[in-house]
């Protein structure tokens, strides 16, 4: 395929991911100081999975912010947090996972480490675990499992999220003796999860995204209706199967162009010999294969 025809988003995705990670964690001097940014930016949720307690974090993690509201003794439905999540999802869907999520980029970098690689095609049922994590750990447990003051824990952040250890606990403990002294069994548990995720990513492609990420689960629910879509021109498609073989998210884009697991990474576009797959943004303009099905 002529590289000149490849969409710039797909061609420069790695640079976009790096830039998004830098902008999300722009307060770099705080890593050396061992302090957190506490400015007005922390009232704004970033689109990807990025820990609030990261020294460099410029904004709040949407998952953590949602749990904080749900687990509050003065719980009121948060139109802001829910609304901004829906806005992100309706505008971009899982494009956020593929381009704007710092932890997603971290997983892809790990997968580049030379090693035997294993397919996840036979493990597709595991993808439904992330919906259980979203429902149980992000919504139900913080809402229902409360203490005597009526406060609930942020269960996902506290017990499962590896990003919190990677971006928060480890950097802060390196510069703060008090934090190092306070590390206990919970940190050990979370560190083991992080280690498992790191090892898993070396051999599998983005397993946390596929199987456990509640933010990915939320965006997946809106992937088919998001304004940012994948389009397949069936007049150009020769049914060679190159796109399905290239997809590391185990999606056959010719059958389901906007599958819940599609992170819009563009690997299928790079593999297509006839330039039949493109990005589209906006209402209408359905792909030929979608129109044919109707």
Where are these regions (language model features)?
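Non-ligating segments of multi-cofactor redox enzymes
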Residues: 1-254, 260-294
């Amino acid at each position: 395929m002529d590289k000149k025809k490849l969409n710039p988003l797909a061609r420069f995705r790695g640079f976009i991911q790096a830039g998004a990670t830098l902008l999300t964690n722009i307060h770099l001097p705080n890593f050396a100081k061992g302090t957190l940014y506490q400015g007005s930016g922390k009232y704004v949720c970033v689109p990807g999975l990025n820990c609030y307690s990261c020294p460099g974090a410029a904004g709040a993690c949407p998952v953590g912010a949602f749990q904080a509201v749900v687990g509050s003794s003065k719980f009121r439905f948060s139109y802001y947090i829910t609304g901004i999540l829906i806005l992100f999802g309706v505008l971009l869907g899982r494009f956020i996972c593929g381009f704007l999520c710092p932890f997603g980029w971290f997983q892809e970098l790990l997968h580049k480490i030379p090693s035997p690689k294993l397919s996840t095609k036979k493990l597709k049922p595991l993808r439904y675990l992330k919906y259980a994590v979203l429902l149980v750990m992000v919504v139900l447990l913080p809402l229902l499992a409360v203490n005597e003051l009526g406060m609930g824990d942020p269960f996902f952040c506290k017990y499962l999220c590896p990003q919190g250890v990677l971006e928060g606990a480890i950097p802060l403990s390196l510069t703060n003796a008090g934090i190092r002294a306070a590390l206990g069994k919970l940190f050990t548990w979370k560190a083991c999860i992080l280690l498992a995720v790191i090892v898993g990513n070396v051999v599998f492609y983005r397993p946390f995204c596929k199987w456990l990420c509640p933010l990915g689960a939320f965006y997946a629910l809106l992937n088919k209706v998001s304004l940012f879509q994948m389009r397949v021109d069936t007049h150009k498609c020769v049914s060679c199967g190159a796109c399905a073989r290239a997809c590391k998210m185990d999606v056959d884009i010719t059958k389901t162009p906007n599958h819940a697991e599609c992170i819009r990474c563009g690997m299928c576009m790079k593999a297509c010999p006839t330039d039949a797959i493109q990005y589209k943004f906006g209402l209408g303009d359905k792909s030929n294969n979608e129109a044919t099905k109707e």
